[in-house]
Amino acid sequence: EYFYARLYNLISTFGGTRMVLTIAPGDATAKALCETLDETFQLSVKKNLRSGYGKCLNVTDRINTAMGANPFVFQVVEAGCPVETSAPQKATDAVSSFKSAVNKARGAALCGIDIGGTDIKVVGIQGGHVVAVKEYDWNPAEMTSIDQVIEPVLLMARVIRSAMSLPQTAEAEQLKTEMLKKGVSDDAMRSAADTVSALYGKPLLLDGIGVCFPDVVIDDMIVGGETLKTRGIRAHSPDYDKEFPRLAELKRMLLKQCRAGGVVHMSNDGSLAAYTAAVELAHSEHAETVRDGVFAHTLGTELGTGWIDETGEIPQIPLEVYNCVIDLGNYPARAFDPMDVRSVNNFN
């Protein structure tokens, strides 16, 4: 069980297309154990039928499909274990990377969208100043189609653009207040955005949109699909693996709200939390503490994890630390429901 859990944690963290296990020639026990991996991790089982250790391969295989790679496999090799060598550590300077990112954003018209499990928070930035903020309540775990996820995100970007385009007049300020007020209906926000266009012309096109999403994001594509937030869609979709990949279109849709040459970048919310902390520290008297990167946990609807490496970049790996097996010995805690704070189970 310890062996399986270690492999499960490695796959949940790093993903990949292949795991090579090297065993000593003649080690019958190790060979027999490795021969159980395909069955234990359910490589030949359909995604919607996998359980236990097999669930980690759902995310890994979706990533591989999105990247045009083959499904995950185990490869067992009988040979002498290679001697591990460590390359000389290169000098790093993540601090410069974090400071450069801020300097590049000065003067730009930007929209940041923080998608969470209970709300979406949106901010509009112009010339380095916050000019519009919006909070939108939602419950993605109860949604039954990808369109229900995509449409509010697109609407939030449109609303922020409209708010950023308004002149500083009493009439415009009233319209802006109504549009950004928490709890206003989707129809009312659409109507307000239409009014902005009718009275003041087409809203500005953004220089960039940044989105953090509570799932695995690789190369600006949402590719996980096993979190609590998409539970309702998994339960109601007749073919979830055709429905879920439609989220990958979100970047293309958001680009329509940017100027020519504008950019949309998407990342996991835990990664963006770590990046935000790193940038803030890089501009403080404690800048040296982030020279080699940052690792951070976030507490929201679920446990999030973010890692910024020593170059100041977000590694393109699943990093599903919330999914890792952390306590094999606590058998009494296994009896509790995953939503019980005493449980060591996750809902997968």
Question: What name fits each language-model region?
Answer:
Residues I115-D119, G124-V131, W138-R161:
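Active-site phosphate/ATP/adenylate-binding loop shared across adenylate-forming ligases
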Residues V20, L110-D114, L206-G210, H265, ...:
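Short glycine-aspartate micro-motif
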Residues K90-A108, M189-A193:
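Short linear interaction motifs
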Residues F98-A132, A296-G312:
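Gly/Thr-rich phosphate-binding beta-strand-loop-beta motif of the actin/hexokinase/Hsp70
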Residues A335-N348:
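Active-site rim beta-loop-alpha module in soluble metabolic enzymes
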Residues A69-S100:
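Juxta-kinase regulatory segment immediately upstream of eukaryotic protein kinase catalytic domains
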Residues L21-D27:
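Structural motif
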